[in-house]
Amino acid sequence: MTVKTPVYLDYAATTPVDKRVAEKMIPYLTETFGNPASNSHAFGWTAEEAVEKARADIAALINADPKEIVFTSGATESDNLAIKGAANFYKTKGKHLITVKTEHKAVLDTMRELERQGFEVTYLGVQENGLIDLEELKAAIRDDTILISIMWVNNEIGVVQNIPAIGEICRERKIAFHVDAAQACGKVPVDVEAAKIDLLSMSAHKVYGPKGIGALYVRRKPRVRLEAQMHGGGHERGFRSGTLPTHQIVGMGEAFRIAKEELAQDTAHYLKLRDIFLKGIEGIEEVYINGDLEHRAPNNLNVSFNFVEGESLIMAVKELAVSSGSACTSASLEPSYVLRALGRNDELAHSSLRITFGRMTTEEEVQFAAELIKSKIGKLRELSPLWEMFKDGIDLNSIEWAAH
C-alpha cells in the first residue's frame, strides 16, 4: 500500500479549496474585477450579480432567505458581530447572556469582553458525552437573559448539540439564539427555520471554500436587531461595512452549493472512513473516544490513548497531519479545556488526537493512519514505566509520588 505522506487528517482545522470552487473564483480576480457597490456601470453590475447568486446558494444550504445573509471575514467575525451586536442592542432589556464552557474561543473570548463591559455571563457545563443538559439550560434562564449562544458541532470533539430543542426554549422565552455553525455546514443538515435560530455563524474554509470569508445569518421574521461592529460605507444593509471581496464570496457560494448537493454522499464517505479507522485501532488497550459517538459530526474522531503523551504521539506520527485540540489553541501545551469540561483527567486530556476526515481523504490513507498510530502507541508505551506498572496491576492513583 503506497500512500503519499504526509496524510492530511485535520479537516476540522481547514479544508483544501475544491477544484470546482477554485475554477469558479479565478475569473473574478482578473476579468470580472468590478466593485459590487459600483452601480453606475457594467463592471459593478456583473460583480453584484455574482455576489447575489452566491448569497442565494449560501441561504439555500441553511434554508434562509438570501436577504438574511451578511458577509463577514469568517466565523470569528460573525461570532463577534452576532454576540456583541445583539448584546449591545438589547442591553436595555437585560444584561445576562448564556453560553457553554466548550464553545470555540471566538465565542468565549467575546463573552469575556462583554463581561468586562458589565454584562453577566453564565457558562454551562456539559455532561460526560459533551452534550448540555437542557434542564440545566432552562434553570439558567432569567428574566434579564437576552442572548443564548451555543455551537451546533464542536470543533474538537465533533458532538452535535440538540439545537432544535434549544431553539424552542429560546423562542418560548423570547431570547435571541445564536449558533456557531462553522463546523456544522456541510457535515450535518442545517435548517434555521426548523431549529428556530436567530443568528448563525458560517465559514467558507471549513467547507472546501477559501479562507478569509464567512457569513452571518440574521433572522428577519421575527426581526433580530444588531449594533454594527464595523463602520463605513454601510455595506451589507449597514450590518458590516467594507468592500465585498467578490472572488471569495463566489468561492463560498459555490462551496455551499456543492455542500448542499453532495451532503448525503459526503456523509456516507465520512462514516465509512470513520469505521475503517475505528476497526484499525481495535485491540489497542486503554483507548477512549471523547464525546458522544451517536450525536456526532460524521468526519470527527477525538481519541485519547492512555499512558501516551499527546505531544510525543504527534511527533511519532509525523507522516500524519493531525492535531491535539483545535488549530487555534494547539500551540499552547495546556490540556484541552474542552476535554477537561468532559471530566477527562489531565493525562487523558493530554493524550488525545483529533482526527478529522474530508472529501479528499481515501480509504487507503485512513487504513495507513490507523496502522501507524497502532504501531507507534505500542512503541511509546514500551518506553513508559507507568504503562509497565499499570500492566502489573498497580493502581496508579494510590501511589504517592515523592517531590524532588
Curated annotation (Swiss-Prot):
Catalytic activity: (sulfur carrier)-H + L-cysteine = (sulfur carrier)-SH + L-alanine
Main EC class the enzyme belongs to: transferase
Residues reported in the UniProt entry to bind pyridoxal 5'-phosphate: A75, T76, N155, Q183, S203, A204, H205, T243
Domain of life: Bacteria
PTM annotation (N6-(pyridoxal phosphate)lysine): residues: K206
Required cofactor(s): pyridoxal 5'-phosphate
GO MF annotation terms: 2 iron, 2 sulfur cluster binding; cysteine desulfurase activity; metal ion binding; pyridoxal phosphate binding
PROSITE patterns: AA_TRANSFER_CLASS_5
GO terms under biological process: [2Fe-2S] cluster assembly
Positions of [2Fe-2S] cluster binding: C328
Key words, A-Z: 2Fe-2S, Cytoplasm, Iron, Iron-sulfur, Metal-binding, Pyridoxal phosphate, Transferase
Main location: cytoplasm
One cellular component (GO) term of this entry: L-cysteine desulfurase complex
Pathways involved: Cofactor biosynthesis; iron-sulfur cluster biosynthesis
Alphabetized Gene3D superfamilies for the sequence: Aspartate Aminotransferase, domain 1 (3.90.1150.10), Type I PLP-dependent aspartate aminotransferase-like (Major domain) (3.40.640.10)
Pfam families: Aminotran_5
HAMAP family: Cys_desulf_IscS
Family designation: Belongs to the class-V pyridoxal-phosphate-dependent aminotransferase family. NifS/IscS subfamily.
NCBIfam families noted in UniProt: IscS (TIGR02006), PRK14012.1 (NF010611)
Protein's UniProt name: Cysteine desulfurase IscS
Protein species of origin: Neisseria gonorrhoeae (strain ATCC 700825 / FA 1090)
